[in-house]
């Protein structure tokens, strides 16, 4: 739980000033939030992918070498295809984490409740919108926030179903 605040603090202290200095705009932008999310999801994707690659029997790699393939061809055409479903799982977990992330993004994204015109504008994510406004929302406003949550749920459901179909296709 505290990792999110650490990532958010890192974004505020390092990324926001960096964007300010490079682009000459307020550092709380969609670009800053995107870079921070990329930094946040990389450990998840790398960890799961590494486990999947290590789970591939070494005989795949060694057999490819024995047939005359180079190291690179053995890795890219024998080992990685065998680990594909695990790598896809890591990517899906990373995307799910990025979609559900609220607090670190709120800290660096500018929290502006309007449509951004570009990467250097502030933005408010759907999850942040729910968190910020649910406390005082009534009637139609509350229903709109619940609809936002349903949209997020459906989006994650579509990602998971797509992943399941890819895994099923991979096993066939």
Each language-model region and where it sits:
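Alpha-helical transmembrane segments of polytopic integral membrane proteins
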Residues: 8-15, 42-46, 105, 158-159
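Loop-to-helix entry region at the N-terminal start of transmembrane alpha-helices
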Residues: 17-44
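Transmembrane alpha-helices
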Residues: 3-6, 45-49, 53-56, 71-107
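Hydrophobic transmembrane alpha-helices
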Residues: 35-45, 95-99, 109-112, 151-155
